[in-house]
């Protein structure tokens, strides 16, 4: 293995391979915990660098800008992200679709046809009498919503083989939530977890605070490789001390042990919960590249494997089983579930989710779990 080859950035492959009985090769690691690619690099360009398409032109628009912490271009990238979010969300989500949380509230809203399962206490008898069809009266959510972001920025998010890193996608998702929930006296705060640090950013209102909040989230230093994520600790930090009822948005790749399910159920007893799962194609399937050395940034462990068809099938099955375990835990908590991918138009996925969610609240369909189909697949 040549010492000139670049370090291989990978996601959680070694942990999944361990479940499949593939032996660990700890000697492949360098002194700094990184590993170097073997005969074939990790998914991305042939030299081992993750593939990132050009930022110029319309083809770059579906992907968020690079939001590397500490970069002198971070403020400019955040302004670009904000303009993109405002232009595309405001253009596609209008009226009652511009928001993430429905009633109940104290202000009367529109009447609609009764659907099985609706609360009969909200029956509008005057409209029912005029139309000879049962109607209920919806309510408008009270103002001054308090939204909390729980943002997982552990080392497994410092990875991406599509148009961006998962970390960039997580920050972009936060920007969309802030845009959809601010205004009208609403407040937004955040708990940012890297596995090494846990940062609490108080909930406040106003544009100045929203900009400062996004700068703090995007500027969170990367945790060193070998640092385990701590989503459970972040959820517990939001639960205790108890905060006023509102919206809790959990942004993570949800890789690793599902040890956070009880904490999430406890959180959902007090708040509306939305889980935003950011993923990459290579979290779900191994590339057909022959022999490759893979490194887990959250453990520092590495494995050299040959990506045979059998191993790739077993890996994909194990990854799918993990995704289903995560989805089951989120359903058990009653959380909304939005999946975003580094190779997808993330804002289009957000729009579809919000529209479907509103339809579910209005009785036109069930509350959605939006899954993203990779580009080029059916």
Listing of model-derived features with the role each one plays in the protein:
Residues 120-122:
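N-terminal juxtadomain amphipathic helix
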Residues 104-105:
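A positional/architectural concept
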Residues 2-100, 113-118, 127, 132, ...:
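Exposed, interaction-prone extracellular/peripheral surfaces
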């Amino acid at each position: 293995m040549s010492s000139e080859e670049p370090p291989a950035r990978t996601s959680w492959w070694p942990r999944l391979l361990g479940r499949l009985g593939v032996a660990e090769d700890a000697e492949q690691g360098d002194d700094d915990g990184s590993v170097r690619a073997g005969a074939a690099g990790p998914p991305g360009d042939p030299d081992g660098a993750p593939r990132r398409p050009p930022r110029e032109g319309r083809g770059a628009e579906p992907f968020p800008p690079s939001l590397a912490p500490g970069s002198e271009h971070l403020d400019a990238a955040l302004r670009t992200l904000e303009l993109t979010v405002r232009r595309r969300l405001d253009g596609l989500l209008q009226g009652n679709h511009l928001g993430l949380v429905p009633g109940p509230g104290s202000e009367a809203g529109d009447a609609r046809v009764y659907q099985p399962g609706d609360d009969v206490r909200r029956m509008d008898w005057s409209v029912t009498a005029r139309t000879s069809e049962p109607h209920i009266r919806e309510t408008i959510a009270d103002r001054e919503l308090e939204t909390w972001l729980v943002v997982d920025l552990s080392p497994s998010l410092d990875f991406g083989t599509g148009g961006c890193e998962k970390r960039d996608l997580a920050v972009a998702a936060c920007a969309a939530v802030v845009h959809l929930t601010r205004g009208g006296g609403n407040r937004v705060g955040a708990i940012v977890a890297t596995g090494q640090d846990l940062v609490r950013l108080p909930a406040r209102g106003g544009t100045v605070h929203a900009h400062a909040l996004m700068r703090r989230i995007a500027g969170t230093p990367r945790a060193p490789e070998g640092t385990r994520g701590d989503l459970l600790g972040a959820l517990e930090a939001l639960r205790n001390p108890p905060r006023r009822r509102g919206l809790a948005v959990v942004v993570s790749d949800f890789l690793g042990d599902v040890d956070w399910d009880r904490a999430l159920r406890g959180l959902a007893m007090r708040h509306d919960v939305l889980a935003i799962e950011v993923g990459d194609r290579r979290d779900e399937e191994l590339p057909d590249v022959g022999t490759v050395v893979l490194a887990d940034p959250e453990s520092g462990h590495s494995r050299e494997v040959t990506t045979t068809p059998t191993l790739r099938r077993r890996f994909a099955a194990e990854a799918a089983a993990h995704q289903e375990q995560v989805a089951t835990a989120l359903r058990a908590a009653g959380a909304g579930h939005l999946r975003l991918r580094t190779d997808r138009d993330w804002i289009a996925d957000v729009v579809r989710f919000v529209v479907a969610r509103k339809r579910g609240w209005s009785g036109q369909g069930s509350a959605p779990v939006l899954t993203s189909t990779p580009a080029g697949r059916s």
